[in-house]
From Swiss-Prot:
Identification of the protein by name: Iron sulfur cluster assembly protein 1, mitochondrial
Lineage: Eukaryota, Fungi, Dikarya, Ascomycota, Saccharomycotina
Gene: ISU1
NCBIfam families from the UniProt entry: iscU (TIGR01999)
Gene source species: Yarrowia lipolytica (strain CLIB 122 / E 150) (Yeast)
Subunit structure: Component of the core Fe-S cluster (ISC) assembly machinery.
Main location: mitochondrion
InterPro entries tied to this protein: ISCU, NIF_FeS_clus_asmbl_NifU_N
CDD domains for the chain: IscU_like (cd06664)
GO MF annotations in UniProt: 2 iron, 2 sulfur cluster binding; ferrous iron binding
């Protein structure tokens, strides 16, 4: 009799384990969609665009590294800018939730081909609206906005370091030409 109870008990435990395992298994796209993620988030999460990195020491590359202490998301976004101030290439690496990855992926598509001034005006509300992010995930779109602004700032600081007196030289050039004439 005791043996039967143990067997039954073990049988119940064995049946309970797969349910527990299924709950703890990695999330499939179907499981994610049940949680209410918009199809655009799922698309950018499952097929992220422009993942990678560039050499941060290149003078035409700006790097933005931002994080959200509340949730642990970290986003690195890099831009490559041509001589006309237009973003030619964009790469990102994000460690975080699906919404953070989707926000990063989307913003890389958004800024490519834009001038630095245009890219600097991008607001998180545009990103959040496009991806239909719920209020609890708005910080992900804020990270993307902060990352692009940080990358632009890094690029601009490299340009100033490379040519610290560019403005002064440009101002002196006409005067020097007049003085020698």
């Amino acid at each position: 009799m005791m043996f039967n109870r143990i067997t039954r008990s073990a049988g119940l435990l064995a049946r309970a384990r797969p349910t527990t395992t299924a709950v703890m298994s990695p999330m499939t796209p179907l499981a994610i969609s049940r949680r209410g993620y918009h199809e655009k988030v799922l698309d950018h999460y499952n097929n992220p665009r422009n993942v990678g990195s560039m050499n941060k020491n290149d003078e035409d590359v700006g790097t933005g590294l931002v994080g959200a202490p509340a949730c642990g998301d970290v986003m690195k976004l890099q831009i490559r800018v041509d001589d006309n101030g237009v973003i030619q290439d964009v790469k990102f690496k994000t460690f975080g939730c699906g919404s953070a990855i989707a926000s990063s992926s989307y913003v890389t598509e958004l800024v490519r081909g834009k001038s630095l001034a245009e890219a600097g005006k991008i607001k998180n509300t545009v990103i959040a609206k496009e991806l239909s992010l719920p209020p609890v995930k708005l910080h992900c779109s804020m990270l993307a906005e902060d990352a692009i602004k940080s990358a632009i700032s890094d690029y601009n600081s490299k340009r100033k370091t490379k040519n610290p007196t560019l403005g002064a030289e440009a101002a002196e050039t006409p005067a020097a030409a007049t003085a020698t004439a």
